[in-house]
């Protein structure tokens, strides 16, 4: 998928989270360690969300692309975010899978995996 398609998937997941009373605090957060697609509060837990948008599963499930290396970069980036914002709170790493025939597909489906990795 293109960057524009990925951005569309991230916006879709942001709306999904808002609809479930999450409070979004960052979108496409970047630092020297990497990027986190979405950062949101779920009650008193700060969630770091990786979004994967796909049109099919021929090459595997989207969650399978959150490799051990990607997880390590996400953890480092999250630690930097917590430190730079002086936060000491419960955290969670979630993965959101967006399935859509094409970007903008009104039939798009989101599979949201809470606590997808530690």
Please report, for each region that a protein language model flagged, where it lies by residue.
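Conserved catalytic cores of phosphodiester-cleaving nucleases, focusing on short active-site segments
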Residues: 36-57, 74
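Mg2+/Mn2+-dependent nuclease catalytic core
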Residues: 55-77, 83
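Short acidic/glycine-enriched loop/turn segments that link adjacent beta-strands
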Residues: 32-34
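Residue-level signal for inorganic ion chemistry
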Residues: 17, 74, 93
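Basic, glycine-rich
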Residues: 29-30, 100
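Acidic-basic catalytic patches of nuclease active cores, encompassing PD-(D/E)XK
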Residues: 1-27
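Domain-level recognition of nuclease-like catalytic cores that cleave nucleotide substrates
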Residues: 84-118
